[in-house]
Curated annotation (Swiss-Prot):
Annotated tr-type G domain residues: 8-290
Name of the protein described by the UniProt record: Elongation factor G
Entry annotated with the keyword Lipid metabolism: no
Upper lineage: Bacteria, Pseudomonadati, Pseudomonadota, Gammaproteobacteria, Aeromonadales
Gene source species: Aeromonas hydrophila subsp. hydrophila (strain ATCC 7966 / DSM 30187 / BCRC 13018 / CCUG 14551 / JCM 1027 / KCTC 2358 / NCIMB 9240 / NCTC 8049)
Keyword annotations from UniProtKB, A to Z: Cytoplasm, Elongation factor, GTP-binding, Nucleotide-binding, Protein biosynthesis
Amino acid sequence: MARTTPIERYRNIGISAHIDAGKTTTTERVLFYTGVSHKIGEVHDGAATMDWMEQEQERGITITSAATTAFWSGMGKQFQPHRINIIDTPGHVDFTIEVERSMRVLDGAVMVYCAVGGVQPQSETVWRQANKYKVPRIAFVNKMDRTGANFLRCVEHIKTRLKGNPVPLQLNIGSEENFKGVIDLVKMKAINWSEADQGVSFDYEDVPAELLEKAQEMRMTLVEAAAEASEDLMEKYLGGEELTEEEIKKALRQRVLNNEIILVTCGSAFKNKGVQAMLDAVVDYLPAPTDVAAIDGLKLDGETKDERHASDDEPFAALAFKIATDPFVGNLTFFRVYSGVVNSGDSVLNSVKEKRERFGRIVQMHANKREEIKEVRAGDIAAAIGLKDVTTGDTLCDEKAPIILERMEFPEPVISIAVEPKTKADQEKMGLALGRLAQEDPSFRVWTDEESGQTIIAGMGELHLDIIVDRMRREFKVEANVGKPQVAYRETIRNTVKDIEGKHAKQSGGRGQYGHVVIDMYPLEEGKAYEFVNDIKGGVIPGEFIPGVDKGIREQLKSGPLAGYPVMDLGVRLHFGSYHDVDSSELAFKIAASMAFKAGFMKANPVLLEPIMKVEVETPEDYMGDVIGDLNRRRGLIEGMEDGPSGKIVRALVPLAEMFGYATALRSATQGRASYAMEFAKYHDAPTNVAQAVIEERKSK
């Protein structure tokens, strides 16, 4: 089967935003204008096409990033049909993992901001992730019809809060209830969308006289930004020549692809204005798969570099970026094809697990409707039904040309709770349900506490875990009791200790056991986790026993000597020891290493680390004192304050242990008028009194 849309006419984009900036409504309008869904779904009444899990409809927030395919030929039918694959991304901080995961497989992104709220805390997180994966982006300032809407303030926020380089592509005509349309600064025409057909048809009109001066000034900025793309254009521009519309667009596109500028558009998705022109900007300025650098990978040895270009002629390589459980067909594995072609029925290699997988059926998703297709090609995003052993971040590739595409990094959970099934019958179902959910979401972990025998679930925040428990009830019909949230503390050392000895010797008839190690232990910088350096000279410990030393230490890292919490940011150097020809074994060295580790750890100024959250509270000014006082009582460190759209914004760093139940406390302190967002910032030494209380509580169990 030949390719139906040339790969140059593909756009793989994410639409991403702060919660409530109107992203789902924006996506709905995109689907409506591209002719996919003929009735616009409103989030207000819980009928949006993209939000397909029951809970999302109830809470009105998007949880799973559904992938949808749509076609667009321009609002004036000025393009050949372009295939736009949209990945809807959640805006709530507890689901940042979903955003990270989708950023990994996008080529470009549309950042949706609220014209009233501007750039909010979650937008910064999403922005950082887009920077990390070098995703070119444009911005859409939504909700221009709302009281307090201000387009240019939002543009300013992109510069000051996100350190981006925004260049408006449009200027709004009126705002709040007088929002009429936009001025296209490239064409210097006003766009007026028809209300009769929900904005499908439109007219170009002259720029309103009262906005002409402002529009000309903004167009100059836009043309200057375009001229900076090349020396030839700059010469032409400085020589007083007009740049053609074609030249301006081409130059702006180049600068967006290089991540040098952010083009900003505006509108009101709810009022059917502006989304159409934003879609044109997606085609004009965001990259096709062929505009993006080849994707890097490694050969199966894990060391030799390899890469794949966006071409049907290269060997098949794809990345699984999401697993979803579907009530009718079981597991759906969403994947992005980077190169090559695969047909349903083909066998491929999961190179991360080194297992064969067979593509049974392949479906293209439209939110929660699916169309079965026979093949997928480079640039496509689709879902496979019936893959057995694929988890998020795995590579699927041609068996004859294996490659491992870079793995995604997933954050460690910061909060855990114990869950117990309400009845014996729920016990088995709960294990199955949690296993399924953990396969879908790598930032969610499940384990059994060895001491208490309880099942522990851990995730990125209270809301994250609420939703997991809720999904167990709805999708798997498992009723569970939930314990009190527990903080994920960590342990580390602050000093270096040298020549710590660990000796395990048992000689009591028959074959004995003998292992003897001498190690140094030292702190590592934050985020380095663990390193093991083998400095054995002259074979005082034979090579085959060295992995045993590493294993012994790794096992101890899972449960530190201080209070049994995982150990992080610590290095070990093995530099001396001894062995016995007959009695030494890997196990003996493993035991010796763990003895040395325990002894050394307690001498190296051990500390308990607690997770610190970045908290941002938006509050009316009247309650500012109460909010700050409360954050101080919670051991918060106030970082700064600034004006927000509806009062003041307070930024603080607060230990997670002090933030439980904060939502309720904030509501009652401000009569429900303040809101807050929080995300994990870092681990930090817990104060002595806190650390002692935590350690004593652990020991009393």
